[in-house]
Design a protein with these regions (language model features):
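Cytosolic regulatory regions built on CNB/CRP/Popeye-like sensor folds
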Residues: 1-161
Length: 161
């Protein structure tokens, strides 16, 4: 015989993986569940094979990505310098939300990868539909970019050995 109330006492493990990933990205910090859902509706899920480019250096910059599964390497294709090796939960390309400059580095999947794309057009749609929410995201984005600039300045200020 099956119990009537089993589902009431189970924890919900079926949380949307996109929402779960977004809530851990500093750009979407301090958003309510409803606000996060509005952002998630504007995202685009993409899959990449191992060694497939997410974007190439000098390509038009359209938006940022959050890694759901897999890994991505950010590198300079001219000098072959690796800037970052990223995996699930990491995000990259966020500067493209603000400016229209070409990509300054390339991104390639180091293994099969599933990414969430959030593009400049999505941010503009968010700002138009929900100005307060759009401003929260812009403020968080500014904070993230400021932190990255500060860290870069500290790295450059270190004496070379």
């Amino acid at each position: 015989m099956k119990a009537i109330y089993t589902n009431y006492f189970k924890k919900k493990d079926n949380i949307d993986p996109v929402l779960k990933a977004l809530e851990n990205v500093p750009i979407f910090e301090h958003l309510t569940e409803k606000e996060l859902s509005e952002v998630a509706r504007l995202t685009h899920e993409r899959t990449y094979k191992k060694d497939e480019h997410v974007f190439k250096k000098q390509a038009p910059a359209e938006g940022m990505y959050v890694i759901l599964d897999g890994g991505v390497e950010i590198f300079d294709s001219d000098s072959e310098t690796i800037f970052a090796s990223l995996d699930s939960g990491d995000f990259f390309g966020e500067l493209a939300l603000l400016d229209e400059e070409p990509r300054s580095a390339a991104a390639i999947a180091t293994m099969p990868a599933r990414l969430i794309g959030f593009f400049r057009t999505d941010l503009l749609t968010l700002i138009k539909r929900y100005p307060e929410l759009g401003n929260k995201v812009l403020l968080n984005l500014s904070r993230v970019l400021g932190e990255r600039l500060r860290k870069t300045n500290q790295e450059l200020a270190r004496p070379t050995q």
